[in-house]
């Protein structure tokens, strides 16, 4: 009986509008829901952890549904010129899609370790639709790579103006990017006045805020300015997706930033 249930599980989930697949980091589910104001959204869940969310309506598909992505976009949009951006971790490709559609002066490289996740993004999170409508790939404004983002960064020959760390396996960040070595390598591969942005998943106060403290300490040794934007400013002990910012430039801080250094 158990074997039969397991065999029927994909069919049962599909009946409920849930698409199931196997990816590098476990069982991956894609399904539709609504956000707090009733707007239809599509969610990506990998091995029991939500990894990405996208609006479903056609006029919102390239907009940003997550607060931390909006904070990152605010920083990037505040930079002059034609910033070179490295996004480590594709997931649903929310930020790359936004940059391709709305910040057309950026040139963005995205490195996703799992080709299966990129396929999910292309087919279910409107990535192919974005590439077709914006022409970003044809114009060299959005370049997709499958591989180890940490290795890609270390091998990069030219500096980036922005490095975004949005790479996760479940709830844990991928690679040594919270360590002293990670902070040093990031600094070495950023250009003058470059900015490092990261999604740090934890609380901002209390015993569950250790990850944020470690990242702030490591990057505070390498950069003049360190701050973060909490997802839950009124509930600091609640784990959330917090936007971490490190730079040595007099950059514009994102709205509601908490200055560490």
Regions found by a protein language model. Give the residues of each.
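Active-site lining segments that contact anionic ligands and/or coordinate catalytic metals
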Residues: 41, 193, 240-241
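Generic beta-structure capping elements
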Residues: 47-49, 165, 249
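Active-site-proximal loop/turn and secondary-structure-junction residues that shape catalytic pockets
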Residues: 202
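The AdoMet/dcAdoMet-binding core of the Class I SAM-like
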Residues: 61-197, 205-212, 220-222, 237
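Class I S-adenosyl-L-methionine
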Residues: 210-261
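Residue-level detector of flexible, active-site-proximal loop/helix-junction positions
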Residues: 34-37, 115, 149-151, 233-235, ...
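Rossmann-like AdoMet
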Residues: 2-81, 101, 137
